[in-house]
Structure formats: C-alpha cells, structure tokens
Regions:
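Conserved short alpha-helical segments that host acidic/polar catalytic motifs at enzyme active sites
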Residues: 1-159, 165-234
Length: 234
C-alpha cells in the first residue's frame, strides 16, 4: 500500500514514496544494494526504489553534516542547515542512474521537501500545476483540472527524465535528471484503456482509433449492420 515509509530520527533522512511504476531490472537494483553493504528486507520494486533513493539521501545528509559540524553550531542549527542545503536533483540523479522501466513516482522527505520524477522513455505519464498557494502532480491531467477548475493549457506535462522539486520554503524547480531518450515510448495500453476519457488528448486519440477501425469492422461484418451488435469493452 502506498506510500512506503522509511523512518529515521533525523527528519532529513525520513522518506515516503508512492507512484506508478514497473521496473524491469529489479534483480540488478537489488544486487546493487547488496554491494553497497545493505541487507534489504524486501525484494519488491517499490521497496528497492525506496531504499535506493534512501541510500543516497543518507549519503547527502552525511555529506552536509560532515561539512557543517566544524562550524561550531549546535545540533538543532546543523539539522536545519542540512535540510536547507539538501540537493534533491543531485541525489535523484545518483539514485536513478541504473533504473530501467516505466515510472512516475512522488516522494516527500521528512523535512518537507518533495519531488516527482518521470522515466526517460516517457512510459508513464505525469502532469503538474503550481501557483502561489499549491503545487500538485498527478498521473492524469483531468484530475488536476477538475480539482482546481483549470483549463487544459494551465496543466503541464512533466517531460521524460524530468523532476518536479518543491523545497519546504515553497521554491519550485524543474530539473532534467535523466537524459530524455531519443525514442519516446509511452504505454499505449495505459492511454487507450486506463486513462480518463475526459482528457483532451486522450479523447481525440480514442476517436481517431475508432475512425481507423471502421474500415476493418465494415469488412468483417460484410456491411450487415442490421445483424451486428456493438458494445464497449467492460
């Protein structure tokens, strides 16, 4: 059940992760965790991704701590400075460099920083919107449009390999984490079957698919519409 949680006494080391993904190299990712000295408690791709990001989150926090502890500041001040200096794009680049598969995932760190990341092939979809009050990411555009009463062009698509990062102070940035693949391969089944038909692009695509099927259907039924029943796929 999403989100998965990685708890720690340090807020900056705690992580919650949720998303829509299917990784194809879980064996390799699991082995990498073993080689780093970990003993993962689970083999599922969700857990492996959580620990993969968590590992580099720990390293980023430790790096900042090692530099700040020499500044003669007290523990609370050091903790707050670490949270301010956390480089989310940097740790996402390191964590995701060997991932293979389709994913649109969202995470939030205990200190309040949040992020969303889309796979570089564009297999899974992700859309975002933000203004002075809110920042939102969802796998489908109509959900955001309906919730915030927005027009189609107000909601933007997160590009393949791109991350949407929100710092706890409200600063928002878009960062290219992984190089966008030359050939973008969105999941056709997701667009044809799973996606909401109220989306502008999905509606047009489905109408076009129906239009392209018409000649084959007419040929298959031999123009006998009186004895043909048309039905939606349940």
């Amino acid at each position: 059940v999403h989100p998965l949680l990685r708890r720690n006494n340090w807020a900056s080391r705690s992580l919650a992760l949720a998303g829509n993904f299917n990784m194809t190299n879980v064996d390799e990712m699991f082995q990498q965790l073993l080689e780093e000295g970990q003993h993962p408690r689970d083999y599922a791709d969700t857990f492996v991704m959580l620990e993969s990001i968590g590992h580099y989150l720990d390293r980023e926090v430790q790096y900042q701590y090692d530099h700040l502890e020499k500044s003669n500041k007290n523990g609370q001040d050091v903790s707050h400075l670490i949270e301010e200096k956390l480089d989310i794009p940097f740790l996402l680049k390191r964590a995701s460099k060997n991932w293979d598969g389709g994913y649109a995932l969202c995470g939030i760190i205990g200190c309040g920083d949040a992020f969303a990341l889309r796979d570089p092939w564009g297999i899974r979809t992700a859309f975002y919107y933000y203004d002075d009050e809110v920042a939102v990411v969802a796998s489908e555009r109509p959900v955001i449009q309906t919730a915030f009463n927005l027009k189609k062009d107000d909601v933007h698509e997160l590009q393949p390999g791109e991350a949407f990062v929100v710092k706890r102070n409200g600063k928002i940035s878009l960062n290219q984490i992984l190089n966008k693949k030359e050939k973008i391969t969105p999941c056709s089944f997701e667009r044809i079957y799973f996606s909401r038909g109220s989306d502008y692009d999905i509606y047009r695509e489905r109408k076009k698919l129906g239009e392209l099927l018409v000649p084959e259907i007419i040929e298959a039924i031999d123009d006998d519409f009186d004895n043909t029943v048309f039905s939606f796929i349940p």
